[in-house]
């Protein structure tokens, strides 16, 4: 819990959980995202499209050249470490023939791959988002994915909103639904006691952090943000929660007030603030201003305004 990994402008950074100057770990012009810590805190898995589509890469916590672990032609995203030597990730390689959406490419499966690389193994044909494994490895929490709803849409309630499930692992896996709100419940993480969990829910308005026991009872609200939704919930072994709110990173412990992590990023811009282009054709939907001195038009998918002169 001493260091936070995050993505900013397509690169992976780390910063002390107490705040301070961020350290840039990746510098590739491709998009690097979704960092995930190994249990021992020594390595970080992340997704990058530096080879075309998104693949799973692994690097040391100090940075350096990352190692590419997956090579499938579809996108692959790390979700959690199974242990220090294995990563669980999402991919759409071979959909289960029993799936109601078969054949299709929308619903991903969960695969397992060694940190040394090699051939991946199918971990679950069921689409499990935001997997959180228990410390003893006997259970996992996840949120389901039932349909094509935009994950950034706010306050909707429908038959395809996400719910939290508890999966007991073993030869015959068993599943228990632990949230029943008609809106969005997602992003579960284990509490330090191993008998309860935190998660994000819109039950009281915008996304906030809530807590329940594994039976789905004893609901308790942890944060009370109102203006914007809480996103990207994670936790460390001691029960400190970390999340994003309004473009900033916060930490909180149950019973305490959230604290913003003050981060200093010293980096060059990857794009120019203003891009000058000479357009000689392709303008559509032209509209002259009421005073006749300006004209608005569409070009290359953007709206432009220019002087008649």
Predicted regions and their residues:
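Non-catalytic extracellular/periplasmic "stalk"
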Residues: 259-263, 271-273
């Amino acid at each position: 819990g001493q260091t936070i990994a995050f993505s900013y402008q397509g690169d992976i950074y780390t910063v002390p959980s107490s705040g301070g100057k961020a350290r840039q770990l990746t510098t590739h012009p491709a998009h690097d995202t979704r960092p995930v810590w190994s249990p021992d805190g020594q390595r970080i898995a992340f997704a990058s499209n530096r080879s075309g589509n998104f693949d799973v890469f692994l690097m040391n916590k100090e940075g350096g050249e990352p190692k590419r672990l997956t090579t499938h032609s579809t996108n692959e995203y790390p979700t959690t470490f199974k242990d220090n030597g294995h990563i669980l990730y999402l991919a759409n390689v071979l959909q289960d023939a029993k799936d109601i959406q078969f054949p299709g490419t929308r619903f991903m499966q969960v695969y397992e791959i060694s940190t040394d690389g090699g051939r991946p193994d199918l971990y679950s044909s069921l689409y499990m988002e935001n997997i959180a494994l228990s410390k003893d490895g006997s259970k996992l929490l996840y949120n389901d994915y039932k349909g094509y709803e935009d994950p950034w849409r706010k306050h909707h309630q429908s038959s395809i909103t996400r719910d939290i499930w508890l999966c007991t692992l073993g030869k015959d896996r068993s599943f228990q639904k632990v949230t029943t709100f008609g809106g969005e419940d997602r992003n579960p993480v284990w509490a330090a006691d191993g008998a309860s969990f935190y998660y994000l829910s819109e039950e009281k308005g915008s996304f906030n952090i809530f807590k329940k026991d594994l039976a789905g009872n004893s609901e308790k609200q942890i944060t009370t943000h109102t203006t914007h939704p809480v996103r990207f919930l994670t936790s460390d072994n001691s029960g400190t929660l970390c999340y994003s709110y309004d473009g900033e990173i916060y930490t909180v412990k149950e019973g305490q007030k959230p604290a913003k992590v003050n981060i200093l990023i010293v980096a060059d811009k990857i794009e120019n603030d203003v891009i000058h282009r000479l357009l000689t054709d392709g303008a559509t939907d032209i509209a002259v201003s009421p005073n006749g001195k300006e004209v608005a038009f569409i070009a290359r998918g953007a709206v432009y305004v220019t002087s008649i002169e």
